[in-house]
Amino acid sequence: YCNVLRNSPHEAEVGSNAIEAMTRGGYWSKSSKTATNEYRISIEGNPYPHALALTNPVGDNLNIKRHGFTGPLGQLLSLKYTVYDDTNEKLFTVVDGGFSNMPRVALVIEHKEVAVLDYGLNRLEMKCITNIPNYSIKGNFLFGDYDIFSQREVRVSSVTVLQCDKQSCFSIQVFDKAELAAAIGIPTAIALLRARIEEHLE
């Protein structure tokens, strides 16, 4: 599911009537290139089209450039949002592949893919915390048999990357585990919300 990031398909500008990217107030450390970064991503849809909202680093003015990835037949495969600060320094990139049957979002920092989120519910909020830009996360987030047209809402409080030698674990912490399990109808929901991290080979 990460192929859209690795195959470098043709990039085309997306018109203003496409999915909108919005910024809201949030936390950011100006020296965060070597420190721990915090972002929150909100994906909303009914189920399509959906909007991608990014937290705004400490209220700074951000320049968001939106591009569309197109396939060999010209079909829109995904959207890429590249976020710059007011000095035109690249902060991070979000790739939204939500135009397939299984929507997905990838967060890319300094050309390193550090978090990939597959989602199918109407709304999912995620906060990614990472300080290992040289590692790439691979794997699916399994939500079981859910209805992507439902109006149910699931909130994920945080995503934490824990490194253990070369084998790392992608751990998700949830505000209310019972509420999450009930929302997706799977008692073992928390156990399924995992992915493996493999060392970035590029």
Regions flagged by a language model, labelled:
Residues 1-80, 86-91, 99-105, 109-202:
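Low-complexity or membrane-interfacial segments used for flexible interactions
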